[in-house]
Amino acid sequence: MSAARLPSRIARHHPRGRAISISGPRRIRRASWALLLALSACRPAAPAARSGGVVDDAGDTVAVAAPPRRIVSLIPATTELLFAIGAGSSVVGRTEWCDYPPAAAAVPNLGDGIAPNVEAVLASRPDLVLLYHSAQNAAIAARLRTLGIPALRLNTDRLADVGRIGRLLGRVTGHAAAADSVAAVFDSALASATVTPTGPRPKVLLLVWEQPPMTIGRGSFLDDLVRRAGGVNLFEDVASSAGTVSIEAVASRDPDLILTTTAGPVAFASRPEWQAVRAVRERRFLPVTGSEFNRPSPRAPAAIRELSAKLRRAG
């Protein structure tokens, strides 16, 4: 399964099934974001800079005017990082999912970041565009560069990307010192928030889609978050960052908890086929609802502490 095909895969399954925590077209796109991040987590990071330009995570060397004054950020994580390092005033366009910090709401909403509206981007007169590293965005980046607009495709899939991408953005925008400070504070907070359990770790199913069941494997943001909070990913042995599993496989592994991203009732819990899973029968769901749980950001240490507290309360 490729990140590039993810949105269409979700669209195909929507008539027969639904995301565990979401409903409706806008939230389907939100699920696409979360899964896109997970599926691309296995890509190696490219070096941050080379002589003559900035090297993005697609390996492209891009000449960027220093510092850009009109940035379109089509990745929620980079929008958050730009504000964190003091470059928020340069952001002139964002996605509908760029919901943090609150000041980002004042930035014009250009719509979807998975399938960007190029005309809306061009209308913003950007001198830098930040795109998620996906096959679909390769053509968009190429078109923008042909028009003389620098475009960087970036991975923001893992906790390790917070400091790395933050420092890259700091150098590009002229906020290197602030970016180094944000990264250092983040690294320290991450170490402090990480839990080393004295007893067995609870097994947590990271379920992001119901029909067919899709889970997060090793190397993803949520996998790292759960591990640092003191749990263990039920499918940590799955080499791919995300994939389809059977309900029978879930039942045989007998998760202690099922992580969901909704605070309300979990609709699939009443479906007959899911009654084979003990955690479903016992309604052992672990809701995590904030945006800090769907993107690597400087808020990740707080997310780890919250998740750790939920794991302890769940027993």
Q: Model regions: which residues?
A:
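Short secondary-structure boundary segments
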Residues: I75, H133-S134, V208, V238, ...
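Short helices/loops that flank or line small-molecule/ion binding pockets
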Residues: V118-R125, L147, T244-D254
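Extracytoplasmic substrate-binding proteins
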Residues: D127-L128, Y132, A138-M214, V232-D237, ...
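Sec-dependent bacterial lipoprotein signal peptides
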Residues: S2-A3, S8-S40
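A short, structured surface patch at a secondary-structure boundary
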Residues: R69-S134, L234, W274
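Bacterial Sec-exported substrate-binding components of ABC uptake systems
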Residues: W33, C42-T79, H175-L205, D254, ...
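Short helix-initiation/N-cap motifs at beta->coil->alpha
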Residues: V55-G59, L110-E119, A135, V238-I247
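His/Asp/Glu-enriched short active-site or ligand-binding loop at hydrolase and phosphoryl-transfer sites
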Residues: T95, R218-A242, T262, L286-P287
